[in-house]
Amino acid sequence: MQPTVIETWPAPAKLNLFLYITGQRQDGYHLLQTLFQFLDYGDTLTIQPRDDDQINLLTPVDGVENEQNLIVRAARLLQQHCKRHNIHPAQFGADIRIDKYLPMGGGLGGGSSNAATVLVALNHLWKSGLSVDTLADLGLQLGADVPVFVRGHAAFAEGIGERLTPANPPEKWYLVAHPGVSIATPLIFGDPELTRNSPVRDLETLLNQTFVNDCEAIARKRFREVEQLLSWLLEYAPARLTGTGACVFAEFDTEFAARQVLDQAPEWLNGFVARGVNVSPLQRTLSGQL
């Protein structure tokens, strides 16, 4: 059966349900333990294969040159890999549009998710036949978070984020909010007060403890908007930072409870409600076509 041409592909958000910094390598990279879960919410990519080798991003993202955008870089990386390995699909280019809902610098993995969706979608649409492992290895060249999106299952990550173990945390509802600022990851990881000596623990131990993000204290100290947002959310539910920020999230057992709090939110709060899912919307879309 020939793969069906799918034009619309999800690029879901992720949350770091916890994030512990356990050390730092000599090359400066931080060692961590984190738990990734996807949201049933994110950007949408519309992809139309081309008969030539042009990669066209038809909806430029403000502040990002097209050739530097992870969407274009992912497509070109896949092209180059196919050429090197004498894989010559009949269709080898693409016109790509993005409907952008996830904030840049928000800690929701938007850019990494976009890259992963391009790798997975074009592998399918071009009929390249590459394995998930190969796509994940390509994704790692684009960013440490790309492989988890390629693999499409919630995961416990260790090392510098490259060692992934599938996990099945509870699928709760989340109120995710953006404080209106963008936080550059190096700003957090470069702070001398960042905790870098959290003990290494196994996943079972971590799942039975209160979830913490070691980056949160630094984000709250440096950005009053993050402090204000977390302080408000914590009045209603457990809440914390995702990634290095700037987005924060509060967890609820039901959609109704999450929406009740969002309905009470002050005007300055910009947020949405979404469900945590252990199988990503991208994986569900792909599985429905094979």
From Swiss-Prot:
GO molecular function list: 4-(cytidine 5'-diphospho)-2-C-methyl-D-erythritol kinase activity; ATP binding
Listed EC numbers: 2.7.1.148
Domain of life of the organism encoding this protein: Bacteria
Pathway noted in the entry: Isoprenoid biosynthesis; isopentenyl diphosphate biosynthesis via DXP pathway; isopentenyl diphosphate from 1-deoxy-D-xylulose 5-phosphate: step 3/6
GO biological process, one term: isopentenyl diphosphate biosynthetic process, methylerythritol 4-phosphate pathway
Keyword field: ATP-binding, Isoprene biosynthesis, Kinase, Nucleotide-binding, Transferase
Keyword presence, Transferase: yes
Presence of the UniProt keyword Nucleus in the record: no
Residues annotated for ATP binding in this entry: P103, M104, G105, G106, G107, L108, G109, G110, G111, S112, S113
Database matches in Pfam families: GHMP_kinases_C, GHMP_kinases_N
UniProt catalytic activity: 4-CDP-2-C-methyl-D-erythritol + ATP = 4-CDP-2-C-methyl-D-erythritol 2-phosphate + ADP + H(+)
Active site feature: K14, D145
Protein family membership: Belongs to the GHMP kinase family. IspE subfamily.
Subunit structure: Homodimer.
Function: Catalyzes the phosphorylation of the position 2 hydroxy group of 4-diphosphocytidyl-2C-methyl-D-erythritol.
NCBIfam families linked: ispE
Classification via PANTHER family: 4-DIPHOSPHOCYTIDYL-2-C-METHYL-D-ERYTHRITOL KINASE, CHLOROPLASTIC (PTHR43527:SF2)
Name the record gives this protein: 4-diphosphocytidyl-2-C-methyl-D-erythritol kinase
Natural source organism: Pectobacterium carotovorum subsp. carotovorum (strain PC1)
Gene: ispE
